[in-house]
Regions:
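Conserved N-terminal structural module of periplasmic/extracytoplasmic solute-binding proteins
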Residues: 1-46, 62, 197, 231, ...
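A structural signal for short loop-to-beta-strand junctions that line the ligand-binding cleft
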Residues: 28-29, 36-37, 63-98, 129-131, ...
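Extracytoplasmic/periplasmic solute-binding protein
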Residues: 80-84, 89, 115-167, 213
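Glycine-centered hinge/linker elements that transmit conformational signals in sensory
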Residues: 118-119, 164-198
Length: 288
């Protein structure tokens, strides 16, 4: 924002919410006479609360920069939000430990492969000195990895099989596969399944940092916690594998990729402010 003002002379005011307080802060700010012209929503759930305030971005230069419509948040034909950070998640893998167990990342191309490797590591856990998976903690700081991210896979494959992109209720076609991958996690991890209720996201990360497990389900946002000054890993030590659940074309499966947060423009703002906001957003994605 500061750089944009320096280049254009257009003032940009940024209001930063405290951690975990974005929605509360947004509600307060939107009630003011000088409400924000640019805000964010957290996917379709967030859009449901704010879509009446969202300007249709269809046909704008900003929307024209999208490489795929899958990065737009739509309501019918209207583009009400545009993703501003694309992230991927999967099984972050300690390749050094994997090789100590006698395997390479290239050996794992399916759920059957993953199961074979994980159960072999568990059988030799005492000898190897590490487990297959970090703890799948069900504490609130960790459970989103399984209640949301892991759950996306059976839902995605059901949507693909049925040729739909929304539904009021899933049929549960692949819920057994969802159970199978989670069972693999909890039965081949650093801790007994009975301990999972109290395990946290920090526990899982620290287990991985301490070389206690080969696989850590998480995403690209974890990079700075694992690699860099004072961190134990280099880029060469890590890779990320797809989360295989035994469904679909596993040989060609990639990482789960998308965005959780989307930019939205306040349609209640003046025409001049809306245009100024669109200009700023376009600059953000095109400026060097």
């Amino acid at each position: 924002a500061k750089k944009y003002t320096e280049e254009t002379g257009v003032p940009v005011t940024v209001v930063t919410a405290a951690s975990g307080q974005y929605e509360t802060t947004l509600m307060s700010e939107m009630a003011k006479s000088d409400a924000p012209t640019l805000f964010q929503v957290n996917g379709p759930v967030g859009l449901a609360s704010w879509k009446d305030y969202c300007y249709d971005l269809s046909g704008t230069p900003l929307a024209g920069e999208l490489t795929s419509d899958s990065y737009a948040l739509k309501d019918g034909d209207a583009t009400l939000g545009i993703g501003y950070v694309i992230e991927s998640y999967g099984l972050i893998t300690n390749t050094t430990l994997l090789e100590k167990a006698g395997y390479k990342a290239e050996d794992i191309k399916s759920f059957a492969d993953l199961k074979k490797v994980a159960e072999d590591i568990t059988a030799r856990k005492d000898e190897l000195g590490f487990a297959a998976f970090t703890s799948a903690g069900m504490d609130g700081s960790s459970d989103w990895r399984y209640k949301t991210h892991l759950a996306n896979l059976p839902i995605y494959f059901e949507y693909q099989a049925d040729g739909i992109d929304t539904t009021d209720a899933i049929k549960g076609t692949y819920l057994d596969d969802y159970k199978n991958i989670f069972d693999l996690y909890i039965n081949n991890s650093t801790c007994d399944p009975a301990e999972l209720a109290g395990k946290t996201g920090d526990d899982s990360r620290n287990e991985f940092l301490n070389n206690e497990a080969v696989f850590f389900q998480n995403g690209s946002w974890e990079y700075n916690n694992l690699v860099g000054d004072g961190k134990p890993f280099t880029d060469e030590d890590l890779t990320m594998l797809p989360i295989y659940i035994g469904v679909g074309d596993e040989a060609n499966q990639g990482l789960c990729t998308g965005t959780e947060n989307f930019w939205c423009v306040n349609k209640e703002a003046s025409a001049d402010d809306i245009q100024a906001t669109l200009d700023f957003m376009y600059w953000c994605v095109t400026s060097e």
